[in-house]
Amino acid sequence: MKIIPILKKLNKETPAEIYYAGKYVCSLVRRKKSNSVEIVVRQIQLQAVSKYLRQHRENLKIKRIRGYISFFADDTNFVIRNPKKKGKYSPYFTLKEDAKEKIFTINAMYLPISSKGVKSLIDVYRGRNDIRNRKIKVIGKADKVTKQNPAIMMETLSLAAHLNYRIDTNLFYAIKSNHALIKKVSINRVRFEFIKIVMSQRPSKYLKTMHASGLMHVIIPELSICDGVTQNRKYHKYDVLTHCLTACDNAERDLLLRLAALLHDVGKPQVREEVVKGGKYKVTFYNHEVTGSKMARRILRRLKFDKETALAVSDLIYNHMYNYEPNRWSNAAVRRFIAKVHISGKEIKRLSRMPIFLLRKADRAANGLNLSEISPRQISFEKRIRQIYNQSRVLHIKDLAIDGIVLMEEFKLKPGPTIGHILNYLLSIVIEDQSMNQRNVLIEEASKYLSTALK
């Protein structure tokens, strides 16, 4: 027997009052599906609910945590609890008391489990009206709520981004007034809500709100100061911040890509120069990708992203400014690029889906000049990469005629960074001239490298 029919049976056969609650009711009102169900049970203890469920459903693994029980069944996550009041749970608290514990009006609605449709909706704080108006509003006075619980400020933005709703005016100004309090919130919580914003359907809309409220200035000041930093109108319609936010919109919904797109030009304010040459004025951002990659790594580590994510995003930013010129790039130059961005047999089959090229696509689409997402030169570049890749025997360290073990045996070296440095040096030689990939030749070159390095 499925869980919902069991609960309906419990509701009918006992004094229990059982209600759908919280985000699940919000989804029902919005006519959206949800794989998580929140249930509030009155007039009966949770222990009795657990017992009844086990009697009617075999092998049900129920977790008991203070105030509620949870389990997975029927492809759904269930949370069942008693009403809450001032941090305590009791089957004898009212729904009105429970609703007061919620943060947002749209999550403070209840529906009797026996109801057909939402006509019997119990709407304590007019949440349904806010859903109609596509508005995020808190229960109580916004200024007081955000001061008492500053985490609500980022949660407001992430919820609005998830639903594509606007933020209540009073709530926005409360966030703006109290934005500095976000420093008191756990960085893990801030990152959690930030990721939800970045991964939403249209992140730029809510990242702009994050900036306008002052939250971005506290959390990612390096990005905030990009506001108003103008660029060459020939290549960019927008300032640096708007360009970065638009690139984030245009990037596919992959966390690494979205983060790289958002931060790809974060180094520009640091290196911006205004130049007059030949009577013509222009703005330059030389090596902004180098500066930006270092900044992005620091930003992401400060936000407690894992090391692998920070390095991957930093690597994408560092390499995103490649400038392929067909007549100037030799075959060796193409091989160097292949090695640099780690193109292997797996990637060559779906080259246009490589993160570095997807980032370039998002970057180009965000310049505001209505250009095609992929330039003819990029198409030509990918074609040539395939051609060179298929012609080349050595493009990665693993393709070399010798490995680290040979180096250690030949030169009596111990495992360590030196081995990697030598192999990278040898790879650079073979990339320039594929015929150099011979054991004796590479050992001789390694010997030269070591004699130079040890001087």
Task: Write out the residue ranges for each language-model feature.
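Catalytic cores of the polymerase beta-like nucleotidyltransferase superfamily
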Residues: 1-455
